[in-house]
Structures are given as structure tokens and as C-alpha cells.
Swiss-Prot record:
It holds the Pfam family RecA. InterPro entries: AAA+_ATPase (IPR003593), DNA_recomb/repair_RecA (IPR013765), DNA_recomb/repair_RecA_CS (IPR020584), P-loop_NTPase (IPR027417), RecA-like_C (IPR049261), RecA-like_N (IPR049428), RecA_ATP-bd (IPR020588), RecA_C_sf (IPR023400). GO terms for cellular component: cytosol. The gene is recA. The keyword Endoplasmic reticulum does not apply. Belongs to the RecA family. The keyword DNA-binding applies. HAMAP family: RecA (MF_00268). It comes from Burkholderia cenocepacia (strain ATCC BAA-245 / DSM 16553 / LMG 16656 / NCTC 13227 / J2315 / CF5610). This is Protein RecA. GO terms for molecular function: ATP binding; ATP hydrolysis activity; ATP-dependent DNA damage sensor activity; damaged DNA binding; single-stranded DNA binding.
């Protein structure tokens, strides 16, 4: 760059900073602009790896969608539990009025510390979200769900009234307001969404999500969660096998998948994932039905190996960190593991 251009650019930058404040424009190499992405673990080792950065990125909008009973709320409650283990504050905007507090506690959520709101209208839900984000004191907000964000005009109208595009306009306006503040306050905002079918689609995928297209554009990460099978113990169904596909990812390559078990009353089976991923990474050895680690047998069959890791959390954490290192994903902080152990002991 010539001296004249350099001088003109410096004058323009000085004018912008004077008008809009320090930090309104900066070079990418100045440090602040090139900070590493801070993440919150999903509670699933496989999903953390599939996301490429070790979890869900803070200061971003995330959308989780899927069919009914696929594990959407369970996954978000696991993320809240992981955040709370690190001392973070979370809020749950329960627009569906369906949060099971006892189930949340079973998943490891510190319920007394969780902020909860059950708004009457979509506008109220998004105003509360905006106020919480602007406070700068909240680390994570979950909105459950976009489909339940009913505009005030629809609630006050008659049952058969047709109000096309009202919810989409509401979401579009809210996201325009929220996105900048979310980035500035480093708050993770998760929108849970439902699936609908497009009528008359002959080719391609007939599925779509509610609330218009704005959320698809503003989301940095979109996760498609599906139940793909049942987990049985003898003849009793004890959980679901779940697949999550990273449909959109602005912080890492997209279209990766994670498959994990969700056990009823327990949530994501972290021990089961450690065993499966440990075998794939050749950190855990499998010979027939026996699993072994560092030459020592840890169980015959997956259920026994899972139980061994549950009883020996320090070995589970050691295997997990070795898996993360082998795949170049951030290691789990010791604090999170210690708090998880303390919670297991209390139970």
C-alpha cells in the first residue's frame, strides 16, 4: 500500500472509531478479532468431535430440530448441565410449557440455579430473550420451541383466522435485533425447532422447519437429530439409539454425523460413546466380547464395560482425553470431570 493510501486509511479508521467507539473496526491480526472460538460441550463426545471445535460455539445462534421424541430437549438439557459444571448461568424459555424439572435434574441440570420462563406469547418470549442477552450476565439461553412462539395477534384472534407469515416476520425481526448482541455478550442461544411437511412436493425432501427462513440464515450451527433404533435389555426398552447430523456449520466443516445412545432417566450414555470411539481410535482393545484398556480387561460385553467406566470416572476421563487428543479436539477440563464425579457420588 502506498503512503498516501495508508494515510487515508488511518484517517478513515480514526474517524470510524471516533464516531462509533473503540473496537468498531479492527484488523484481524490485532488479537481481539482473531480470538479462539469458545465452546460448550454437548455432553456427547461423538457430537463434540463431529462439530469440529469440541462443542457448540458461544456468541452464536444454534438450531436443533427433529421429529417428536427424537431427543431435542434432552440434548439441550445436557448442554445446560455441561455449562453449569463450568460455573455458567443458563436460562430456559419454555414456550411449550412442557419442561419436566425432575427429568432435567436426572440429566445433571442444577435446577435451583436454572432460570426458567413460561411466556404467554411469542413476542414476550423473544423480548425476555433480548433482555437476558443484553444483560451480559447469561452464558446460554434455550428457546423451546420456535413452533410454540405464537404471535400475540394469533392468540387474540379467532380459531379459524388466517394470518400467513406472521410467525416468520416475528422471527426475522427478533433475529435481526439479537444477533449482534449475542456476539458481543458471548452468549450461546439455542432454538429448538419442529419439523413440518411441505404439501405437494414431488421431488426432494418434503420436510421443513417452522418459523420461516430467517433462523436458517442466522444459525451458525444447525443440528438434525433423529431416533434410529431402540436399546433393549432383555425384552425391556431402556433407551434410544440417536443420530445427529451437523447440517450447517460456520465454524468447522459441516455434514459430519454422530451416533450415540440416550438412556431413559440418564440422558446421553457418555460411557457407551467412550467405549465405541475408543475402539475406533484403537485406544480401547476389543477381543470377542471382552473390552480392555492398557492391557487390563474392563468388562465382558458393552453393558459391563459401561458399568466399569461409570464406577471409575478417572479412567473414563483419561480415555476420553486420549480420544480427543487423537482427533485434535479440545481436551475436557478437569473441573468438569470432577463436578460430574461429585454428582455421581451424591446420587
Amino acid at each position: 500500500m502506498t503512503a498516501e493510501k495508508s494515510k487515508a486509511l488511518a484517517a478513515a479508521l480514526a474517524q470510524i472509531e471516533k464516531q462509533f467507539g473503540k473496537g468498531s473496526i479492527m484488523r484481524m491480526g490485532d488479537g481481539e478479532a482473531a480470538e479462539d472460538i469458545q465452546v460448550v460441550s454437548t455432553g456427547s463426545l461423538g457430537l463434540d468431535i463431529a462439530l469440529g471445535v469440541g462443542g457448540l460455539p458461544r456468541g452464536r445462534v444454534v438450531e436443533i430440530y427433529g421429529p417428536e421424541s427424537s431427543g431435542k430437549t434432552t440434548l439441550t438439557l445436557q448442554v445446560i448441565a455441561e455449562l453449569q459444571k463450568l460455573g455458567g448461568t443458563a436460562a430456559f424459555i419454555d414456550a411449550e410449557h412442557a419442561l419436566d424439572v425432575q427429568y432435567a435434574a436426572k440429566l445433571g441440570v442444577n435446577v435451583p440455579e436454572l432460570l426458567i420462563s413460561q411466556p404467554d406469547t411469542g413476542e414476550q418470549a423473544l423480548e425476555i430473550t433480548d433482555a437476558l442477552v443484553r444483560s451480559g450476565s447469561i452464558d446460554m439461553i434455550v428457546i423451546d420451541s420456535v413452533a410454540a412462539l405464537v404471535p400475540k395477534a394469533e392468540i387474540e384472534g379467532e380459531m379459524g383466522d388466517s394470518l400467513p407469515g406472521l410467525q416468520a416476520r416475528l422471527m426475522s425481526q427478533a433475529l435481526r435485533k439479537l444477533t449482534g448482541t449475542i456476539k458481543r455478550t458471548n452468549c450461546l442461544v439455542i432454538f429448538i425447532n419442529q419439523i413440518r411437511m411441505k404439501i405437494g412436493v414431488m421431488f426432494g425432501n418434503p420436510e421443513t422447519t417452522t418459523g420461516g427462513n430467517a433462523l436458517k440464515f442466522y444459525s451458525s450451527v444447525r443440528l438434525d437429530i433423529r431416533r434410529i433404533g431402540s436399546i433393549k435389555k432383555n425384552d425391556e426398552v431402556i433407551g434410544n439409539e440417536t443420530r445427529v447430523k451437523v447440517v450447517k456449520n460456520k465454524v468447522s466443516p459441516p455434514f459430519r454425523e454422530a451416533i450415540f445412545d440416550i438412556l431413559y432417566g440418564e440422558g446421553i450414555s457418555r460411557q457407551g460413546e467412550i467405549i465405541d470411539l475408543g475402539v475406533q481410535a484403537k485406544i480401547v482393545d476389543k477381543a470377542g466380547a471382552w473390552y480392555s484398556y492398557n492391557g487390563e480387561k474392563i468388562g465382558q460385553g458393552k453393558d459391563n464395560a459401561r458399568e466399569f467406566l461409570r464406577e471409575n470416572p478417572e479412567i473414563a476421563r483419561e480415555i476420553e482425553n486420549r480420544i480427543r487428543e487423537s482427533l485434535g479436539v479440545v481436551a475436557m477440563p478437569d473441573g468438569a470431570g470432577n463436578e460430574a464425579e461429585a454428582m455421581d457420588e451424591e446420587e
